[in-house]
Amino acid sequence: MREGAGVPAPERCCSIGVLALQGGFEAHAKALRELGADVREVRTPDDLDGLEALVIPGGESTTIGLGVEREGLAEPLADFVRSGRPVLGTCAGMIMLDRDHLGLLDVSVRRNAFGRQLASFEVDLDFDGVPLHAVFIRAPWVEDVGTDVEVLAEVEGHPVAVRQGNILAVAFHPELTDDLKLHQWLLDRVSAA
């Protein structure tokens, strides 16, 4: 059983969206369902209606960006994030949120900073004082952090997990491990609202 799973789902759980244009959206949806969330795949602006939180998954950031533009999702995604609802961006999702893309997270992210596919790796992180196993695949790192951004984890001296307000962004793929802490973070933020 995955770490964090097995806890009885609350009587009323939350409606979480997963951007489903390309990439690892199915694994995120599965993890969230294991925690009792109602999950909706987001492909159009209307799919954001009524959601309480959102995951922007990993994948290929250029392809995801083109899909966001093609489907007219850039401004609706920005409005969603600015509304204060919790958002988790993973790998390419971190890139999509940065200053150079959607401009919603005050960081600059370097794509494929840890190398190509063959340079993929796993590591145990100190994630804001909590142990967390992380899978990095053609992963980015944060090159520049704004003053309102909190660095939660680093690898080789480079930030790989940051938080700014309602946004948690990580350079790795939590959906590829048995640890559901980051998905639980979304549900906890919704419950606290």
Please give the residue ranges for each predicted region:
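Cysteine-nucleophile active-site neighborhood
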Residues: E60-L125
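Pocket-forming structural segment of enzyme catalytic cores
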Residues: D100-V160
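C-terminal and late-domain segments of enzyme folds
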Residues: M1-P8, W141-A193
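Beta-strand-turn-beta hairpins that frame and shape the catalytic cleft
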Residues: R12-C14, G129-L132, V162-L168
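Structural motif
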Residues: V55-P57, L88, F136, A169-A171
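N-terminal beta1-alpha1 cap of cysteine-dependent amidohydrolase-like domains
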Residues: M1-R70, D79, L180-Q184, D188-A193
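Cofactor-binding loop segments of dinucleotide-utilizing enzymes, especially the Rossmann-like FAD-
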Residues: L21, A92, F172
